[in-house]
Each structure stands twice: as structure tokens, then as C-alpha cells.
């Protein structure tokens, strides 16, 4: 600033009227940099005297101002700074005087409203390069609060260089680590170096994390931080040999920092850092010596998932399938942040546990002597094994899309064990039982008596209906898939849903099953051009003729294709069914997928469930339909593992006698008597042909692929055709009003089970319980649980509860959560709250009052002091 500008400023200030009770004005001109010490002769003031402090004339100046001259205005030029206020002999005069500064530091401090004292001024000078740019000063002004102490100013500068508004140690540390572990390549750390903030950064790290090295390194800091944090849930002795990276006194802060990162939005960066730490510390080799229980609650390292999964998979391969260990471990791990990276492996093992539990329940095997009873047991219980197998293979196939070199081969060994349990024990045992008890009736009648028949579908469900009926026929939707669909419809829609079954016609292939679902008095078969055609009362039942067959019985009928409907506008859809009493909608996702590859079938089942739910919504919303039937033409058998020669039967014994055959059925001339096949009466014996089927899961040898996914035979999986009766309940319906609580689907709720409301440790646990079992009208929900102070500020980490338990036994619906309080001071007279909130934010939060009484609680770190 030019001296004439200074003179102008000072004269202007002396011209201002004096405050009340003041007789003169004294202005202290601070110039610690002595920029104007040699220019004082140029200062000529209109109505004030100038006196300069030299360091040796302080007493004389004080005497002059206090005794000798009590009326003159003065400018006291002060080029001296004092570390301690008591060293300033003129302090009492300064306190009632005005201050004036001409240096850039003063201007910056004034601009930012930073308290002007020696310690703050010294620090602003230290960061002169930083404050020299308006854009960087603007970042300080944009922060949540004005720095009032040197520590806050250090953090404000670092926060500005990080590009964040919260000048908090956690935020700064995490942003630096997110920039990479190589100091030379980390842009944030290099900006610290450029603007002289690196020493402050390492001082903050030293006090907060306990990491102190002569040559500090970001990679070593990451190792120290994550390992120290892990000792909160992992016993320190498990990390023997890594003591130099551990600081137990700083454990709470390191855990809090890592926990905050774990629950942030940039998990991939933490994943990379955690993998780096694992490699540098050789963690997999150390931790693989521990038990699953030792590791189950530690989440910061991804390798822990690989170790846990490896141990469980190895045990399964060794024929050790501990259902409780697997289910409890998966329950603990699924709330951890890296679960999504390993979801397919965990969920696959959970299905193995379900299969093993089923095996234990039926360890005596399958020996029911009555075919009708076997059918009933399959429809009510046994089908669950098919679902577990399907869900396992869904997880397995998805795991192949995200390869993990440490787990892939082990998971494939698990597949081998699953195949043994499912294919040989379940399909083999149940298949033999069923084949044995149904053989006579199948030979004599072509069906099992006293079981509803697919060929009666139209007469049983459509003809008696007193309102419009819409039928969805999903090709190859077997019973267990329909059971999953029915469960989801109950939970997701306001409806009454019943699941029933009927025995599919033989052979269980599309052209026969689709024909059986059409109206008819008699089904016959006609051989034409070496192709067996199925006729309903003499009419073709091919897909192009089904609309005609339906209209022949009721002109107000129509046959539609799902794939056509889905692409139409709402008005176009509605026009198709306007005035119709009977609507058949054909859906083909599962069977169509089998034509691509056998392994596409189970993913197609998942898609089919979603598509069928969508079709139900379209019928309700666009068609105004309330009564919907969902069924299939047939089911299917599927096994993943390659079949052996023992799983096949040669057709040489009936060569030249076959009219048509597939891998699971054969239609032959009446006089045929093939070996190794069961006779099945064909179409009530009203044709010149007879039928045969392999026992259990045996396939007939033939050229081409498609050995693993098959249908056409008499197994329960192929012949148990589902019938879902779906009745949509409108709000005004009598049934809904009478049973509103039954039909309204609500999320299950979670409440605190522990009785104590006092916390006396930084680490503690609480028990919670799920009030209702997940059922038809109670859906699973995920809850987040944490502690806050009376102002809502979190004072603990956050735990997750996945409330999806289906057991009717309340003792099975409990959850045990471990909490860690933040490193701060707690008051035993203040009120704290446990908060239970659903993850979607759709329910009102639950709050429980707590007292926190910790004798030696750690106060918040006062960095740099």
C-alpha cells in the first residue's frame, strides 16, 4: 500500500466523530513485517501525532500517552509482536484504542473474519501462499464455520485443499487416502506440500491415529489405520508380528474413521486400499489359521470373506455341512459392507445349508407306499428341495460372471456335493419311490387316481366361473417355481392367492399339455407326415388354432401371446379383451431359454416370475381383471452335472417300434414291449399307440444336446402342474374390508429386546427381535440402528439388521448387534437415544432413551494442541 493511501485512511479515521465519553483517538498501527519502518517520514497527518515503538521506548511511550499528553490524537506505529500478552506494556491502552493494519495478512484475516491475535496471525503468515489467491480464500469462507483457533485454521486450510466444506479430521484423512497411497502421485497430498500443510497433516495423523514415523508414508498409514481399527473386533494377538502397525490407545478413533469410510459412497477406493493392506501385511496367510467364529464379526478386510468362504466350502467338500454354522455365519456376514462382492458365494452356501437341513429332516429316505400320499407330500413339502437346488445354481452361475481366483474352484467342489445330494439322494430316492408306487396306476389308467387332472382344467376352473376368467399359461413353469411366484404375489399385491396342483397329461411335453388345458371332451393323437398331432374333439390344438378351439366352446374367448401384449399401449391391450369371458395368455420364457442352453433355464425361471407378476399387474390395472389363473403345460427335470451311462437307456430294445420319442418318453405301437421303460396308458387307450417312460431320472439315448434339461416323463417335477388361483381384492370388496389386516402387506418391524437402558462401556451389545415372521402379508425389511445425542448427532457406529426371518418361533427371530461408541466425552446426566430406522425411510423412526455413563471416556481429540 502506498504511503499516501495510508495517510488518507488514517486522516479519514481521525475525522470520524469520537465515541461517547472519548476525548481523543489513539490508533495502533501494527506492522510486524516492518514494511513501513523506513517510510515513517512520509507520513504527515492532519490531526494526529505519530510515535514509533522501537522495542526500547515502550515505557516512555506509555508515560507520554498516560501522563504527559492526554489530549492529542496519536498513531502508535507498532512493528513488534508479542507471544504473550503480559509482555505487552501497552496492552491496557490498546484495549481502548483502535487497530490499523496495512499488510496482506491483516487484510486476509479481516476479509475472512479471523480473530486477529499473534498465534492466528503467525499461522496465516505460514500459509501466505495459500491465502494469496482469492479462490482459495473463498473456499475457507464457504466452509461450515469460521476457524477460531490455530487447530481449526490448520484443518480449514487442509479441508479447502481437499475440496470439502467440513473441516474435520476424519473428512481430511479420508480424502487424502482416497487420492492414492503414493505421495508423489496423490494430488491432495501434493497440494499440502505446495502450500506448507504437510507437517500439519502428519501432526493430525500422529495425534488421532497414533502413526508416527520420521519418514511418514501414506501406504504405511493405511496399514496402521486399518489394522488398528480391526483390533476393535479382532483380538490383537491374532496380529502378532504386526505390533508396529497397532496403536491400541488410538483404536477407537481408527475404528470410527474406517467405519465412516465403510459406510460412505466410495467403497471401491476403500476396497483397493484394503486389498493393498492385505498384501503388504500378508493378512490372508495369518488369518487363515483362525476359526470362522474368530473372523465372523470383522468386516474391513475383503480377504476375511474369502477365508470364511474357503473354510466353509472345504468343510462341505469334506462332507461336513454344519447347518447352524453356515446359517449363522451368513447372517453375520450379510450385514457387512463387502457382502455384495461375495453375495453369490454366501447365498449359494445358504442353499446348501437348506438342502442339508432338508436331508436331515428326511434322512430315512422316501418310502411312502401310496402314490396319492407321495403326490401330497411333494406338493406340500418335497418341492422345497427343487427350489433350494434352483437357487443354489442361480448363485453358482452368477458367481461365474464375477470370477474370484481364490473361491472359484472351491465353489465347483461344492457343486459336486450338491449334485450328489440332489441328483442321487433326492431325485434318485424320491424318483424311485414315486415310480414304484405309481407304476400300476400309470400302466392301467395313464394317471394316478384321486389326483386332479390337467385334462379336466377347463371343466373344473373355466366352465363353472360366473365372471370373466383370465388364464396365464407359462410354458415349463414347474411347481416349485409357481410356489415362489405365489409367495411373491401374496406379499406384493392385495390379493387372495391359492396354490394347487394337478397331474399333467402324459407325455409331459408342450403339445400335449397345451391341448389338455383347452376345452375338449376327448383328446386324440393323429400321425400325419410322420408327426404326431394332438386333437381336441377332432380339432388341431397347434398354437395357431387354440383361439379357434376356445371360441368353439365360448365365442367370447381369445388366445393371446405375452410377448405381443407387453409391447402394446394400454388402450390397445384393453381392446383385445373387451367383451371377452375367457382370455388365455401364453407365456414362454422358461422353455424358450432351454433351446439356447440348459444352464439358461434357472435364470429364465427368475425372469419368468418377474414377467408373470408384471402380467398380473397389467390384467388388474389395464384389463380390470380380478380373477386370474396361472398354470403351465408341464414341468421339467434339470440336473447340472454331466450324466453317466448309468443315467441313460438305449432305444435298441424298441427300435422300429417308436412313433415318437424324446429323452423322457416314447410313444410306440401297441405291441411294443421295450426293456427298462415303464408302460403308461396313452390318452385313455383310445388310440392305436401306447406310451412308455424311463424310471426316476433316466434319459433315453438320442442324438443332440439337451440332456440336462428334460421333460416328457412321469417324475413329480415334470408332471406336477401348478394352478395358482389369484383373486385381486379391491379396497371396496367385502372380503378385503372384513380381513383388511390379513391382506394388507406391511414390513415386519424390529424392536429392542434388551431390558437395560444404561451403557457403561465404549463397546457393548444389544439384542433385538423381529415382531412377526415374514409371511404372506408381512414382508422382509432392513433396519439401521445407531445411537445419537439429544440433538440427533450420531455418537456410535451404525449396525444393520436384515429382518427376513420366517420362523414362527419368536426365539428364532432375534438379532445380536455389537456397537462401538465414538471417541468423545459423554455426560451421565445427558439423554442419548437408540434409533431404529428402516433403510428405505418409509416408517417412523423408533427412539429409545439411554444413559451413557463411562468413567474414563475419551474426549474428542484436540489436534495440534
Residue ranges and their predicted role:
Residues 475:
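Ligand-binding pocket scaffold of soluble enzyme catalytic domains
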Amino acid at each position: 500500500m502506498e504511503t499516501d493511501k495510508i495517510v488518507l485512511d488514517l486522516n479519514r479515521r481521525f475525522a470520524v466523530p469520537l465515541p461517547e465519553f472519548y476525548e481523543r483517538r489513539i490508533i495502533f498501527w501494527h506492522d510486524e513485517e516492518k514494511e513501513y519502518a523506513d517510510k515513517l517520514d512520509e507520513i504527515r497527518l492532519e490531526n494526529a501525532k505519530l510515535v514509533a515503538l522501537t522495542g526500547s521506548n515502550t515505557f516512555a511511550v506509555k508515560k507520554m500517552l498516560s501522563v504527559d499528553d492526554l489530549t492529542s490524537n496519536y498513531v502508535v506505529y507498532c512493528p513488534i509482536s508479542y507471544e504473550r500478552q503480559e509482555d505487552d506494556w501497552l496492552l491496557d491502552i490498546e484495549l481502548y484504542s483502535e487497530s490499523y493494519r496495512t499488510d496482506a495478512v491483516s487484510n486476509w484475516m479481516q476479509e475472512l473474519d479471523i480473530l486477529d491475535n499473534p498465534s492466528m496471525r503467525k499461522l496465516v503468515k505460514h500459509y501466505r501462499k495459500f491465502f494469496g489467491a482469492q479462490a482459495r480464500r473463498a473456499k475457507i469462507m464457504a466452509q461450515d464455520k469460521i476457524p477460531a483457533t490455530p487447530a481449526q485454521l490448520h484443518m480449514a486450510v487442509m479441508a479447502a485443499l481437499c475440496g470439502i466444506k467440513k473441516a474435520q479430521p476424519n473428512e481430511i484423512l479420508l480424502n487424502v487416502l482416497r487420492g492414492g497411497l503414493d505421495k508423489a502421485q496423490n494430488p491432495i497430498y501434493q497440494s499440502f506440500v505446495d502450500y506448507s500443510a504437510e507437517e500439519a497433516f502428519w501432526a493430525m495423523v500422529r495425534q488421532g491415529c497414533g502413526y508416527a514415523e520420521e519418514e511418514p508414508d501414506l501406504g504405511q498409514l493405511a496399514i496402521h489405520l486399518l489394522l488398528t481399527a480391526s483390533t476393535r473386533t479382532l483380538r490383537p494377538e491374532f496380529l502378532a508380528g504386526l505390533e508396529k502397525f497397532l496403536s491400541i490407545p488410538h483404536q477407537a478413533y481408527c475404528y470410527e474413521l474406517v467405519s465412516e469410510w465403510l459406510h460412505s459412497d466410495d467403497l471401491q477406493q476403500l476396497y483397493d486400499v484394503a486389498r493393498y493392506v492385505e498384501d503388504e501385511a500378508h493378512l490372508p496367510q495369518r488369518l487363515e489359521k483362525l476359526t470362522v467364529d474368530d473372523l465372523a464379526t470383522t468386516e474391513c478386510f475383503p480377504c476375511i470373506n474369502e477365508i470364511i468362504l474357503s473354510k466353509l466350502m472345504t468343510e462341505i467338500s469334506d462332507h461336513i455341512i454344519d447347518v447352524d454354522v453356515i446359517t449363522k455365519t451368513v447372517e453375520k456376514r450379510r450385514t457387512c459392507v463387502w457382502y455384495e462382492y461375495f453375495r453369490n458365494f454366501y447365498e449359494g452356501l445358504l442353499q446348501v445349508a437348506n438342502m442339508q437341513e432338508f436331508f436331515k429332516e428326511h434322512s430315512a429316505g422316501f418310502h411312502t407306499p401310496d402314490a396319492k400320499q407321495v403326490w401330497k407330500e411333494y406338493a406340500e413339502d418335497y418341492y422345497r428341495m427343487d427350489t433350494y437346488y434352483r437357487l443354489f445354481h442361480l448363485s453358482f452361475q452368477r458367481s461365474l460372471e464375477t470370477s474370484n481366483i481364490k473361491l472359484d474352484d472351491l465353489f465347483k467342489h461344492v457343486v459336486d456335493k450338491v449334485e450328489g445330494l440332489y441328483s442321487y439322494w433326492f431325485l434318485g430316492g424320491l424318483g424311485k419311490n414315486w415310480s414304484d408306487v405309481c407304476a400300476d396306476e400309470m400302466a392301467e389308467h395313464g394317471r394316478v387316481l384321486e389326483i386332479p387332472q390337467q385334462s379336466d382344467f377347463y371343466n373344473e376352473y373355466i366352465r363353472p366361473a360366473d365372471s370373466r376368467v383370465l388364464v396365464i399359461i407359462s410354458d415349463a413353469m414347474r411347481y416349485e417355481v409357481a410356489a415362489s411366484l405365489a409367495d411373491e404375489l401374496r406379499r406384493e399385491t392385495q390379493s387372495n392367492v391359492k396354490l394347487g396342483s394337478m397331474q399333467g397329461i402324459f407325455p409331459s411335453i408342450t403339445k400335449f399339455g397345451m391341448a389338455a388345458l383347452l376345452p375338449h371332451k376327448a383328446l386324440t393323437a393323429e400321425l400325419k407326415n410322420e408327426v404326431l398331432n394332438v386333437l381336441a374333439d377332432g380339432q388341431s390344438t397347434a398354437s395357431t388354432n387354440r383361439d379357434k378351439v376356445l371360441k368353439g366352446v365360448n365365442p367370447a374367448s381369445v388366445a393371446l401371446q405375452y410377448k405381443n401384449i407387453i409391447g402394446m399401449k394400454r388402450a390397445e391391450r384393453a381392446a383385445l379383451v373387451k367383451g371377452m369371458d375367457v382370455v388365455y395368455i401364453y407365456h414362454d420364457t422358461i422353455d424358450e431359454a432351454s433351446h439356447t442352453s440348459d444352464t439358461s433355464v434357472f435364470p429364465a425361471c427368475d425372469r419368468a416370475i418377474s414377467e408373470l407378476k408384471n402380467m398380473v399387474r397389467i390384467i388388474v390395472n389395464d384389463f380390470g381383471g380380478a380373477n386370474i389363473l396361472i398354470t403351465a403345460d408341464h414341468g421339467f427335470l434339470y440336473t447340472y452335472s454331466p450324466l453317466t451311462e448309468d443315467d441313460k437307456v438305449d432305444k435298441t430294445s424298441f427300435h422300429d417300434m417308436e412313433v415318437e420319442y424324446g429323452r423322457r418318453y416314447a410313444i410306440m405301437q401297441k405291441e411294443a414291449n421295450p426293456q427298462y421303460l415303464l408302460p403308461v396308458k396313452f390318452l385313455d387307450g383310445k388310440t392305436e399307440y401306447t406310451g412308455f417312460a424311463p424310471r426316476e431320472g433316466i434319459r433315453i439315448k438320442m442324438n443332440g444336446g439337451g440332456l440336462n434339461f428334460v421333460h416328457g416323463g412321469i417324475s413329480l417335477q415334470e408332471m406336477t402342474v401348478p394352478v395358482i388361483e389369484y383373486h385381486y381384492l379391491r379396497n371396496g370388496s367385502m372380503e378385503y374390508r372384513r380381513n383388511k389386516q390379513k391382506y394388507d402387506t406391511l414390513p415386519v418391524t424390529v424392536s429392542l429386546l434388551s431390558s437395560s437402558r444404561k451403557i457403561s462401556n465404549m463397546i457393548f451389545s444389544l439384542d433385538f427381535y423381529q415382531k412377526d415372521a415374514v409371511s404372506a402379508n408381512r414382508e422382509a425389511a432392513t433396519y439401521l440402528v445407531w445411537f445419537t445425542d439429544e440433538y440427533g448427532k450420531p455418537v456410535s457406529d451404525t449396525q444393520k439388521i436384515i429382518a427376513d426371518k420366517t420362523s414362527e418361533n419368536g426365539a428364532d427371530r432375534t438379532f445380536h448387534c455389537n456397537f462401538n461408541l465414538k471417541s468423545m466425552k459423554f455426560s451421565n446426566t445427558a439423554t442419548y437415544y437408540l434409533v431404529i430406522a428402516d433403510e428405505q425411510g418409509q416408517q417412523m423412526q423408533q427412539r429409545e432413551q439411554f444413559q451413557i455413563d463411562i468413567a474414563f471416556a475419551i474426549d474428542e481429540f484436540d489436534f495440534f494442541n
